[in-house]
Amino acid sequence: MFGERLRQLRRERKVSQKELAEYLGISIRGYQFYESEDNEPNIKTLLALADFYGVTTDYLLGRSDRRN
């Protein structure tokens, strides 16, 4: 669920994985691991993603269908 939501939000905003990785200060591969759900972000990164997309962490994690 988390990876799907990240991918959907990124595509809606028309942002590349490279741009997001740079924003987060991580490698592109590190970001790709989030979208493929091979790795989970730490709380700092999760909060940065929620802020970037203007959604709640609960939405990102699939705990809620409400974005804000």
Language model regions located:
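Short, charged recognition helix plus adjacent turn
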Residues: E12, F33, D51, L61-N68
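DNA major-groove recognition helix of helix-turn-helix/homeodomain DNA-binding modules
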Residues: G25, K44-Y59
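Short basic helix-loop element that most often maps to the first helix and adjoining turn
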Residues: E4-Y23, A48
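Short, basic-rich loop-to-helix N-cap that marks the start of a DNA-contacting helix
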Residues: D38-A48, R67
